[in-house]
């Protein structure tokens, strides 16, 4: 294996035309340059430099190696510059994934804020439900993903680390003309006889949260239709097909022919996390994005509290 540092010495000898001039340029002694060239010749298995009355002359092998050395040293310089840029958030790439309701609320502000601070970092965002997002993270195809769980503690996981962002309470959606639409706060027990429109069981954590809440309220819901599109669910509710439970993150836009009602002080809640790989290198870009996500989520939760107090 050829030593890169010795190749740098050879390049200076070729540029300067003598060992002494190369030594001055590199801040070496002349004997150190001579030793480095001799060691490189042993590694190469051939003569690279010939001395003459005017200084030194490269052999054919020496000229060939200098050409490669120029390319190698240039690539190393590029690599060092790129690494410095990444460390200083002046370059690099960050791959994100988020489910639709977070992708329409938390992520736009987080990405805009991140780009305002670190415009040279390339960001990509892939829409994906929590389970596929975590799969991408495990496969090394994403750096930061947003995940939803049904419990306030993160799942036990040897590979994925989760940082809490916010608790996302769920609200009841009813048609405007519903008998309970006039009430600002409802108890889930009051809705025991309703028909329900829910997400697809198994693919949507909201369903398991709702079913568990119904069990605690003492009834089994009558689920008459399934959809994983929250805006479509609003349409089905408006059409009188039933009630639904919609998380706060999905209420960025609400139809005027439905009403959204609170389920009291302890509503069903899902929990939003920023997920990354455990024990993997945390790049400056990844750390910066986690900090931005925490900021945006805290502001979202604070604004939600302010609206609740004002209503």
Stretch-by-stretch model annotation:
Residues 148, 194-217, 282-291, 297-307:
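Secondary-structure junction motif
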Residues 129-142, 148, 202-259:
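Hydrophobic hinge/microswitch elements
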Residues 2, 117, 248-257, 265-311:
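C-terminal effector-binding regulatory domain of bacterial HTH transcription factors
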């Amino acid at each position: 294996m050829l030593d890169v540092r010795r190749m740098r010495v050879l390049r200076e000898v070729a540029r300067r035309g003598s060992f002494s001039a190369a030594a001055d340029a590199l801040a070496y002694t002349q004997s150190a340059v001579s030793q480095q060239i001799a060691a490189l010749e042993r590694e190469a298995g051939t003569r690279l430099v010939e001395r003459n009355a005017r200084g030194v002359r490269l052999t054919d092998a020496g000229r060939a190696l200098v050409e490669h050395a120029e390319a190698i040293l240039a690539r190393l310089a590029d690599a060092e510059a790129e690494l410095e840029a990444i460390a200083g958030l002046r370059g690099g790439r960050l791959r994100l994934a988020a489910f639709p309701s977070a992708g329409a609320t938390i992520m736009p502000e987080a990405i805009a804020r991140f780009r305002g601070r670190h415009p040279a970092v390339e960001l990509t965002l892939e829409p994906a439900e929590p389970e596929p997002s975590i799969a991408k993270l495990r496969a090394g195809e994403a750096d930061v993903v947003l995940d939803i769980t049904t419990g306030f503690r993160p799942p036990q996981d040897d590979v994925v680390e989760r940082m809490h962002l916010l608790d996302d309470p769920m609200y009841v959606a009813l048609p405007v003309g519903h008998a309970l639409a006039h009430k600002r706060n409802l108890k889930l027990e009051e809705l025991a006889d309703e028909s329900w429109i829910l997400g697809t069981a198994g693919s949507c954590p909201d369903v398991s949260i709702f079913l568990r809440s119904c069990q605690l309220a003492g009834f089994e819901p009558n689920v008459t239709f399934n959809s994983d599109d929250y805006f479509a669910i609003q349409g089905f509710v408006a059409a009188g097909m039933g009630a639904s439970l919609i998380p706060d993150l999905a209420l960025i836009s609400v139809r005027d022919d439905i009403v959204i009602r609170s389920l009291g002080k302890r509503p069903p809640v899902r929990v939003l996390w920023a997920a990354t790989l455990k024990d993997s290198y945390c790049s400056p870009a990844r750390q910066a994005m986690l900090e931005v996500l925490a900021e945006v989520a805290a502001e979202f939760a604070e604004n939600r509290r302010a609206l609740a107090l004002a209503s």
